[in-house]
Amino acid sequence: MAGNKSVVYHGTRDLRVETVPYPKLEHNNRKLEHAVILKVVSTNICGSDQHIYRGRFIVPKGHVLGHEITGEVVEKGSDVELMDIGDLVSVPFNVACGRCRNCKEARSDVCENNLVNPDADLGAFGFDLKGWSGGQAEYVLVPYADYMLLKFGDKEQAMEKIKDLTLISDILPTGFHGCVSAGVKPGSHVYIAGAGPVGRCAAAGARLLGAACVIVGDQNPERLKLLSDAGFETIDLRNSAPLRDQIDQILGKPEVDCGVDAVGFEAHGLGDEANTETPNGALNSLFDVVRAGGAIGIPGIYVGSDPDPVNKDAGSGRLHLDFGKMWTKSIRIMTGMAPVTNYNRHLTEAILWDQMPYLSKVMNIEVITLDQAPDGYAKFDKGSPAKFVIDPHGMLKNK
């Protein structure tokens, strides 16, 4: 193979589709017999990619982006035993070895082993997190294949539902993890901050877990409409009424059992401050509306270094939080990236057995080509309600 057409980062809001070298079964001059090379079937644009696009999460120029990957095995190393050429697989966005203490304790989100970047406590494709090239490309290298990859047993069946299954590499497990972290269970009342793709997946996950009422708040009316059309409760955060009052109008009480932050550090304020970036906004609003003894899951990304912060403290990841309120209410919180391997198999079965028929409606997937990827990023940046799925080889045309 001569080359590999890919989405390449060249600076803030500057992405280019270029041909980079075809991947080899090696990384940083180290042979990887436990790796495979995939022909990418689908690869999605994520909200996390938008942090990079907007210059808020640093990656080096020339880096290939993308961490939501589904692909077909076209080459494998001699140590790969469970995957065969031609297998259709989903790739967790966490790069994890399956061998270290954290992986063995079901914490693949913070694998200790792949120490390419000594400053990172985790590995992921497409970020500057231990140097792994991204999957918004025609082909991609995946290490630790036997541990990492989820193989679809019935390839034809999986391709029929590929627009849903493409979500299990990241955002569906991420949203679901936020709900699990928040203790969502049958009968729960849930408030989700953010109606972007992760927030919508969190809403879908909360319903799958049996929540009685799922409320999603956002400033984007088009994204909120996707949720309301699927039967979820929504709150337009541009409304000047206090969030507690708006929740009270829905539930008859101003607090919920469980909260999910699906926004992260680029959050905005409420009401008159809806157009103002407020890094602590989502978290403080959750501290306010989650009941005493409740819990909050925080899959939204927060960073230790922001190149373009709204204030000095935010630039180093220090936020002004209502910690006293959270402590007094004894709210349990859990942060961090989702350990995708804990959830992807179960969520795949839920999709294949039609337990999430509302997923396609709320996600509003739009399939695009690799060449259209920079335009997809620009539309997403402007608030598009679509979830953009890149189809590098034209394999999703009739799906």
UniProtKB/Swiss-Prot annotation:
Record keyword Cell membrane present: no
Residue numbers binding NAD(+): 47-51, 174, 197-198, 218-219, 223, 263, 268, 299-301, 336-338
Principal EC category: oxidoreductase
Gene Ontology molecular-function annotations: formaldehyde dismutase activity; nucleotide binding; zinc ion binding
CDD domains: PFDH_like
Binding-site residues for Zn(2+) 1, renumbered to this chain: C46, H67, D170, H177
Keywords linked to the UniProt accession: Metal-binding, NAD, Nucleotide-binding, Oxidoreductase, Zinc
Keyword S-adenosyl-L-methionine in record: no
UniProt xrefs under InterPro entries: ADH-like_N, ADH_Zn_CS, GroES-like_sf, NAD(P)-bd_dom_sf
Documented activity regulation: Inhibited by the substrate analog pyrazole but not by NAD analogs such as AMP, ADP, ATP or N-methylnicotinamide chloride.
Binding residues annotated for Zn(2+) 2, in chain numbering: C97, C100, C103, C111
Catalysed reaction equations from the record: 2 formaldehyde + H2O = methanol + formate + H(+)
Cofactor(s) the protein requires to work: Zn(2+); NAD(+); NADH
Family matches, as Pfam families: ADH_N
Subunit relationships: Homotetramer.
PANTHER family cross-referenced by the UniProt entry: GLUTATHIONE-INDEPENDENT FORMALDEHYDE DEHYDROGENASE (PTHR42813:SF3), ZINC-TYPE ALCOHOL DEHYDROGENASE-LIKE (PTHR42813)
Annotated family: Belongs to the zinc-containing alcohol dehydrogenase family.
Identification of the protein by name: Formaldehyde dismutase
Organism: Pseudomonas putida
Lineage: Bacteria, Pseudomonadati, Pseudomonadota, Gammaproteobacteria, Pseudomonadales
Recorded name of the encoding gene: fdm
